[in-house]
Amino acid sequence: MKELVIFGNDYPTKDGTCIRDYIHVTDIAQGHILVLNLFKKENEDLLKDNCAIYNMGSNKGYSVKEIVESYEKANGIKLNYRFGNRRKGDAVIALPDCSKIYKELKWIPKIGLEQMCKDSYNFIKMHPNGLFD
């Protein structure tokens, strides 16, 4: 495996790496289906100008280093990684406000971090050169 670079380890977080919200692609797809169903006639009250904006996320932030460690643990592997310089413009913490989709559509993600890590690893093993290669 190539070397994974974690950009920055000097942020004001518990382990020095950025914090982000991670979500499984299956949860995203299910959220998209719920939003697309809004465009049915009976849901006009939730639409403004045939437009609806919803953020999706788990409402839980994980540091980049926590993700790497979770990936290693979930899959029983050791990743080859190093810390690089910060990227210009990276926010210390980036978490979406998902209250609208939780409230209006009763959508919540169902797949946790450990399963996300396992599914990602299995996908990469099945498609080492990418999905369409």
Where are these predicted regions, by residue range?
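C-terminal substrate-binding subdomain of Rossmann-fold SDR/epimerase-dehydratase oxidoreductases
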Residues: 1-133
